[in-house]
């Protein structure tokens, strides 16, 4: 072992120097093979022995299409049997062309002139100063994790700053688009958009934008392929991951994408690596390229899907005019220069397609976005148990997809099917319904079978307790397993669920975000993302359904663990205790009741 130590030390030093020394993947691999062939040999043996035989990193698509999991951020190759290759017209060009060099030059300023950049900067500074005056509260340590304490003096502030800087890398890795220098972190405004937001803010105290851009000039023509190009700044592997995200958008909407790297005419999306994760919003109204910047830390399918959504016309979820009914902005905890990132839209200028507010949207900020310190909550969900739902970047939510289809694909199918459980006619396959997670079948009439485990199903309840658990409980479940239960009470009764025993589901404790989770949908609309439970403490309160049904989803995307067990039963409405209810319908009913009383 003593003889091996110097050799291993030199080998690993050479290995990391090669990897970190440049962006050219092919050259790096060639150098590694020629100079570190013993290490490569050992790595091949180890990887061959340890690779899962069932392809565990390929997850089940809840929407019925084969695609690589949005959780997997390290895809090197894709099986032809797993990914359809005909959905996107793509011609890969491995050398930088003259056209790509033109795109690279334009991408440095996102296609804007120096005058336009100065105008945007001017209005953003105005917005920042206005919001700082509107919310001058000093920092207070409220609604933080249990280990957080109030900041008492300069010494403790210094400690917090040190901790914050130490955690920056982890924060950027989690939701890198929130750490950008642009509007709301990752939105590159043009001069007209910046002016409109500022004027609206001065007049109304909020911005005039919406979850989806209203202007027809900025919408893409859904009857033609959306042209996209690469400017040559991404590796072949990075290009393929980006195309997988486009392929996912293709599969779940009526939109088609076509790659053309060899011309500069026509509106198009150009993928570049110029500055973090960032995008313009919607199509350029004058036919110029619409740039999407994806740095190496952004090459994750969930983050790419988020940025492509901006390019197609999406703004952020928590900026909707009805957001105060669902989240509370902790202005006192927001970084002083970032308060303009939490502006709200006008209710008279909204295009949300009648799609309700979605805690699980891939466009939603996480709980601690733009905090002055990382332990400070900047967004609190008004129903506490949704706190770990917001901010996910794993996959597009059902309502994200539904809104995109409402905007672009409403005329794709001649007939609308009588879909159940909140589903709607699939614009890509008009003979079937697109179903919420947990349901399947032509009309969403069946509960989705377990994936990777024999679990889930429909359970008819009585007044006696029944038990449901994660696979293999009390032993560990495995990564990639999924279970869906539909709990059904007799007519006129409700479903009660309570957790007990050991509970362990992987989460980002510091960021208050579930990675693996048990999700409970207990409202009247199963299309809405439910409350997600995770981390390492057993939830205490009982959960009641708003109707006779409750949907329970177990999803293990990242790693195995102990899991959960829960008791379920039916209860008459006369036994119903309002304090145990956690339901969007009950919450909205209370909001309406208070609104009537106040008026």
Curated annotation (Swiss-Prot):
Cofactor detail note: Binds 1 zinc ion per subunit.
Pfam family, one: Astacin
Disulfide bridges in this chain: 254-409, 277-298, 413-433, 435-444, 455-483
Residue ranges the record assigns to the propeptide: 23-211
Activation/inhibition comment: Inhibited by marimastat and tripeptide hydroxamic acids.
Entry EC number(s): 3.4.24.-
Glycosylation sites per record: 251, 522
Domain annotation Peptidase M12A: ranges: 211-410
Record carries keyword Secreted: yes
CUB domain location: 455-571
SMART domains, A to Z: CUB, ZnMc
Location within or outside the cell: Secreted
Protein purpose: Metalloprotease which cleaves the carboxyl terminus of procollagens to mature collagens. Probably involved in cuticular collagen maturation.
Protein name: Zinc metalloproteinase dpy-31
Annotated source species: Brugia malayi (Filarial nematode worm)
Gene that this sequence comes from: dpy-31
